[in-house]
């Protein structure tokens, strides 16, 4: 009996040591930190293919990615994959916010693994992400941002949680699955003037979207709210027991991919940043658009940001518009809509043309008789041979 107890105690100690190693990221395959990104093409360099974007002229300075801080709110199907992609890209710092735990029901989605069931999502995500890239700094918060106390702390961290403590984050990403949390993020970012991106997947799992929101410049989430928000309907009353939204890892992977792609374009200043990009998996349709802010938005901070944006735009120096004269088009008015423009200059035309008769205004000649060039003084003597004789001479040649 005593031997069994001692064996169990030994096993407990081993498990505790293993748990400590996992928490600290100390296990096989864990690499050391890399101080400086390198474009050297070797198997041991995790950044060589990322730095190739610079060599190919896509990104001017990819190393700048390490100077940015991004906050990801919601570490579920979209948020966890978003955090993983940013980690692999070498982002400087990630702030993760979520209050949920990993469940076996999450395994149909990406990132999390069965042995992480029971852990908080932010804790499980941090452990995995540190092993993927130890160069990234992580800050995790396991709470619901919609409560009063937590909301104030959330605002404090996105306004002071940058790489340089006391500086704001560069971007906030909303990857939550409910409108209450979206409205909380919207309110916080409007009050702080913080640029953020919103994302979501439909309940039937076959469509999704991303949206870039610049307070005062573009429509916020409250400017054109969904019916559930506009009608002040409690989301909990819409959910029946035993009924849940559908979930496809493919759709969530696509939405996370276009979200991070938009983040990289925004932070590293390349390509065209999308203000709104939708995804419909049924027709493989990707609609895009940009929405202006609503002057009667219910969010007072949004209206305030709109006024400040108008003042900034009015203070900018006006750019002078250069008027470009259009070339004269010949034969513009005809039944076939044909526009014919001469490629010959007027000087060349005059030199090659003969005398032009006097015609009424608006009438032009179709062609002119070319000027006859003077003949040379060389004269060919007449041989007085007939045509038949000349043909016979040619046959003998």
Swiss-Prot record:
The protein in question is named Ubiquitin-like modifier-activating enzyme 5
- SUBUNIT field: Homodimer; homodimerization is required for ufm1 activation. Interacts (via UIS motif) with ufm1; binds ufm1 via a trans-binding mechanism in which ufm1 interacts with distinct sites in both subunits of the uba5 homodimer. Interacts (via C-terminus) with ufc1.
Q: Which positions in this protein are listed as binding Zn(2+)?
A: 220, 223, 297, 302
Q: Which GO biological process entries does UniProt record here?
A: erythrocyte differentiation; megakaryocyte differentiation; protein K69-linked ufmylation; protein ufmylation; response to endoplasmic reticulum stress; reticulophagy
Would the keyword Secreted be found if you checked this record's keyword annotation? no
Source organism of this protein record: Xenopus laevis (African clawed frog)
UniProt short sequence motif UFM1-interacting sequence (UIS), positions renumbered to this chain: 329-341
**What's this chain's function?**
E1-like enzyme which specifically catalyzes the first step in ufmylation. Activates ufm1 by first adenylating its C-terminal glycine residue with ATP, and thereafter linking this residue to the side chain of a cysteine residue in E1, yielding a ufm1-E1 thioester and free AMP. Activates ufm1 via a trans-binding mechanism, in which ufm1 interacts with distinct sites in both subunits of the uba5 homodimer. Trans-binding also promotes stabilization of the uba5 homodimer, and enhances ATP-binding. Transfer of ufm1 from uba5 to the E2-like enzyme UFC1 also takes place using a trans mechanism.
Q: Which comment does the entry carry about domains? A: The UFC1-binding sequence (UFC) motif mediates interaction with UFC1. The linker region is required to activate the active site of UFC1: it region moves next to active site of UFC1 to reduce the amount of water molecules in the vicinity of UFC1's active site and thereby elevate the nucleophilic activity of UFC1 active site.
Binding of ATP: at which residues?
77, 98, 121, 144, 178
